A protein has these predicted regions:
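Glycine-rich beta-strand-centered segment in the early N-terminal region that forms part
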Residues: 12-53, 91-93
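NAD(P)H dinucleotide-binding glycine-rich loop of Rossmann-like/cofactor-binding domains
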Residues: 49-126
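C-terminal hydrophobic helical "lid"/dimerization subdomain
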Residues: 202-206, 247-299
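Residues in the short beta-alpha loop(s) of Rossmann-like NAD(P)-binding domains
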Residues: 152, 220, 246
């Protein structure tokens, strides 16, 4: 469960009734012979459903991807029927606690893929939440230089424990000046902004170099209205793009986990039993930004 799932519990903007949760692993109980899946096989589920596979013929530039747990019923149940294309077998070397982050890794892969980066480029990441730290780890793997910015010292410490060398706390340092020092005066070529990170977007123009690229990533569900001075964006001729899902990147995400590229230690805050959800959710909702991932054990 994530902060988005908690927002659904709180009654924010979802089309009810709906079953939340978009990340799940499980065991195959039944499978068609043509599916390639085996009974008892450990799998991770993709929440992405392509609404119209013929979108290109209709002139659309990007596919309309629905997300289970947000646009339709999700995975918070003890049994679910899934199409084979949404079911991915897990290699033996991937632990359950790592596999549960496949969806967020896929989103981070797609987000960085939307940028035309080159080795050695600086990438400022606004928010040291789970997605932000995963994106920073990927930056290192791609030989980029991540700079993670957050007001939460605990989250920054977690980022540092994951090998992120440059972290900035705006309450302790001038963000722009610190990035100038880190980049040798260039500022960041790229900035990733995840609105659910609880960071404000007003840093974007001041930390991104002229002509740089900004990617707004994550889900646009349950967000408050965010304000960004477009005059500053125009003045610096910033390129702005958006990535709201990891559709098409699940195999890459699994491969990254299998090769130990992504370290998920510290991302899971607690594990609760399925029968305890009604009691635990009110406690979690009191400060959903304090939580990375809450795992629900349905066994």
């Amino acid at each position: 469960m994530s902060s988005t799932d908690v927002a659904i519990f709180e009654g924010k903007k979802a089309s009810y009734p709906i079953i939340p949760v978009r990340s799940a692993i499980g065991l195959v109980s039944e499978a068609h012979a043509m599916s390639g899946l085996k009974k008892g096989e450990r799998v991770v589920l993709s929440p992405y459903v392509l609404d119209d596979p013929f979108y290109k013929k209709k002139g659309a530039l990007v596919p309309d991807v629905k997300v289970m747990g947000l646009d339709m019923d999700g995975f918070l149940c003890d049994f679910i029927s899934m199409p084979p294309e949404n079911v991915y077998p897990l290699p033996e070397g991937i632990k359950d606690n790592d596999a549960i982050f496949t969806e967020q890794i896929a989103l981070a892969v797609k987000s960085l893929g939307a940028l035309e980066t080159e080795r050695g480029d600086y990438v400022a990441i606004l928010g040291a939440n789970t997605l932000g730290i995963i994106a920073a780890e990927l930056c290192i793997y791609y030989q980029l230089v991540p700079i993670v910015i957050d007001v939460d010292e605990t989250k920054l410490s977690l980022a540092e424990n994951h090998g992120i060398y440059y972290t900035i706390n705006p309450s302790k340092a001038d963000v722009r000046q610190r990035i100038i020092e880190i980049t040798g005066g260039k500022l960041a070529e790229f900035t990733l902004y995840e609105p659910r990170s609880n960071m404000l977007p007003n840093y974007i123009p001041s930390i991104t170099q002229e002509g740089g690229t900004v990617a707004v990533i994550g889900y646009n569900y349950f967000l408050s209205n965010l304000q960004l001075n477009l005059g500053d964006v125009l003045e610096k001729q910033l390129n702005v793009t958006a990535v709201k899902n990891g559709y098409g990147e699940f195999n890459t995400a699994i491969n990254l986990l299998a090769n130990k590229v992504i370290n998920t230690e510290g991302f899971i805050d607690s594990v609760i039993k399925f029968d305890d959800i009604d009691r635990e959710l009110p406690r979690i909702s009191e400060d959903k930004y304090a939580y990375g991932k809450v795992v629900v054990d349905c066994m």
